Structure formats: C-alpha cells, structure tokens
Amino acid sequence: LEVFAREHGLKIGTIADLIHYRVRTEKTVERVSECTIPTEYGDFRLVAHQDCVDNELHLSLVLGEISPEEPTLVRVHMQNTLCDLFSTGHNACSWPMRRAMKQVAEAGRGVIVVLRNHDTTREIIQRMHDLQLHDRSDPVPPRDASPAHLRTFGVGAQILVDLGVRKMRVLSAPKSLHGISGFDLEVVEYVDCR
C-alpha cells in the first residue's frame, strides 16, 4: 500500500490518525454533572457524561488528582446488572466493580468508567444461563462484539481524556486496543485482578 501511495502521490493515514482527527472535530461525549459520593472505599468524585449519539448517560468514579504525565490506574467497566447489583465474585462476571474500587482506593488515585447499557430481558436471562454453566465448570461461550459494543471503546476513551487521563495502568486482562493512541491515550501496564 505504501509503495502504491508513493507511486501515485497519495497520502496514507493510520487508524490512529483518523481517530485523532475525529476526536478533535467531532466530540460525541459531554460532561453533564459532577458530585462527591461517599463509598465504603472513601469519597470519590462521581462524574456523569452524556453520549450524544445514543443519549446514554455514563458514570465515572474518580479518586485523587489525575495528572496526564503520571500513569493512572484505570478500569473501563461495562455495566452488568446481575454481577454489579449482587456484587458476586463469580468468575463469569469478569472483574467485579467493588474490587476495582478497592484497588483504586489502595492506590490513592484512579478512574473507573462505568459504561451503562440497558440490559434486555433476553440478555439478563442469557447471563443467568452463563452463571449456571460456569457453576458446572462448563465453559461460558464467548459473545461476539456487536458494532454498538465496539463503539463503547471510543466512548470510554473520550471520557478518560476528558477526565485528564493520558497514561493508563489498566485493570484488565491484556487486550489489543487498536487506535487508542488516536485518543492520545497510552497503556503502560495491565494490572491483574487481586
């Protein structure tokens, strides 16, 4: 592709370049409210962001001062009604919200972004089935990521940037985050669930 572009005098842009351009020209997330909320892990700043595309409200818990120069402990958490509401430590629930809050509190500063979604009846029943399968030691089948689910990565990234995060210590299993540099974000470390 690079040879073809050179031969025909064309410019090549990366996915990160495209994302960077769109973030500068098309902001789709807006901070709409903020307050202090006491939790069992201390007082966090609760920040609400409105997604202008689907009108969804996403929430973030921020602890301490966030500096773009310092790596920040970060968890981007997809809301899961069953796992979050009942605080289960079940392995089918991925990383428990309370555990992420505890780790951020122990670190003294960090950000937890909760990307909200409205679980349908079918999705809740499927998650209940996954819990039952996992109890029997059967593998939980992977779910294909829908285009809407994939879009949430960009929403989470915009929220992190708005909160002042640039370098991240991510509370998650390692994963490939193509184009994250287009948001001026950098993953410096993945932190295991304790």
What are these regions (language model features)?
Residues 1-194:
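Catalytic domains of riboflavin
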